[in-house]
Amino acid sequence: MIFLQFLLPQHLLSRLMFRFARIQVPWIKNRFTSWFVSKYGVNMNEAEQEDISAYEHFNDFFTRSLKDGLRPISDSKIISPVDGVVSQCGSIDESKIIQAKGKSYSVSALLSDKSRNDSYASFATIYLSPKDYHRIHMPCDGTLKSMKYIPGNLFSVNQNTVNSIDHVFSRNERLVCFFETDFGEIAVVMVGAIFVGSMQTLWEGQITPPYTKSVKTFEYKNRQIKLSKGDELGRFNMGSTVILLLPFDSPSLNIELGESLKMGQSVT
């Protein structure tokens, strides 16, 4: 299966998934959503709308909102921005981020920015499984400085692939949001993957598709976009991975490899 990913038309398949996930024909979207809930064990009791037939299309279900109060926001300085599992975390040594045992990639490659290679001290990589809540929230109070769309591959980001393919996160398509906080600049990296139909933010809307072949930078210094800890910042329209990069003056991370997190839970 790993080798097959190099042969598959990754972007074509993701575009097809984008269209399929927006089919509004009731029997198609309801049957597929019902299968998905059963296959992946989605807890619909948490959803604000529990009736799967009430969703406009599959993507509407996939990016569903939760009932009020289910994700309380911790008083700690930094919270988990998503529901998911910690696939890696720790210190960034010599500007290298651990991907898996024996594999790493550079900060500059991930961000497509050599000037930020030595800007961060620690990281957390959080994998969102198909059953998870797929909205992304602010890990702390911050002001949006800039955002960068970086084109790339669309390899799967499941653990088997991450353990097998070098530099997956710095090779895959990604969207990087830079925020100024009380303890310095943080980066929230949304990593795309095969079948991730699109990524979107609250301030720009849908970023992909269309897919481009060049890096695109968005500057926000004059717009004063301020977000509070726990505010929604974006969504995966089909899921993937979020990487959080923290600066040297940030509180220390207090999470473990393999730990399951809920959005709003303290990570420091």
Where are these regions (language model features)?
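Contiguous, well-folded functional domains in the mature portion of proteins
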Residues: 1-268
